[in-house]
Amino acid sequence: MQRYAVGIEFSGIQYRGWQTQQPGVASVQETIERVLSKIADEPITLHGAGRTDAGVHATNMVAHFDTNAIRPERGWIMGANSQLPKDISIQWIKQMDEEFHARFKATARRYRYVVYNAPHRPALLHKQVTHIYQKLDVQKMIKAASKFEGTHNFETFRAAACQSNQPVRHVKHCRLFEHGRYLVLDIQADGFLHHMVRNIMGCLLEIGQGMYEIDHIDTMFAAEDRKAAGITAPPDGLYFIQCYYPEQFDLPQPPLGPHWLNLPE
């Protein structure tokens, strides 16, 4: 039995998220499993580093699978990409020891959320960025983002349906930066709760619109109640961009994504 790690890029527009759903509901995981199973001539189960919501994208989702099939790495990539839909692509594949696990060996995960702040909507980036037409106080949002760094109970900032046993997470960095009309939130943590990034972004957008002051974030944390926070930002602008592992696994590190997502801070 061979174990392979894979790096996957996908647009989430047509899918109900990463995780396999009930029959007839499109998911990224099930779509890839179906293709890999055909190539391997045996059932394949993918184990992903994380789960993404419906409409959320990824530039380097890491997953792994086990198989008895023997194929060169290039053969897996070319075979899969020739059969996958155009909005899913295998970027790399690497044979691993059994010790590797895409989810449980991950030490951190990283997302970027992209906002296009302009009076008109961007037709070419439809459902790839979140369009906000209102004028935003960007400097205030930048200061507010740092409030989420460190170890906190994120009960207020997770979905009511979140299934995680405990809401405490350590956020290594939470930074907002501006490039012209683009606002990019870059956040890295040891793990994320359901809707956590989208709820944080929703909070920052409301602060940028003057709905409340930065210190109100402390009140939200203290409440430990989802109702204490504001909107959940749309999925359109959210990207899973990186997953971190111990150096011993030596996984490829591709670029973060297209130029408007790969903007330097």
UniProtKB/Swiss-Prot annotation:
InterPro entries: PsdUridine_synth_cat_dom_sf, PsdUridine_synth_TruA, PsdUridine_synth_TruA_a/b_dom, PsdUridine_synth_TruA_C, TruA/RsuA/RluB/E/F_N. Pfam families: PseudoU_synth_1 (PF01416). The active site is at D53 (nucleophile). Keywords: Isomerase, tRNA processing. Its EC number is 5.4.99.12. Substrate binds at Y111. One of its GO terms (biological process) is tRNA pseudouridine synthesis. GO terms for molecular function: RNA binding; tRNA pseudouridine(38-40) synthase activity. It catalyses: uridine(38/39/40) in tRNA = pseudouridine(38/39/40) in tRNA. It comes from the Bacteria. Formation of pseudouridine at positions 38, 39 and 40 in the anticodon stem and loop of transfer RNAs. NCBIfam families: hisT_truA (TIGR00071). Homodimer. Belongs to the tRNA pseudouridine synthase TruA family. This is tRNA pseudouridine synthase A. The lineage of its organism: Bacteria, Pseudomonadati, Pseudomonadota, Gammaproteobacteria, Moraxellales.
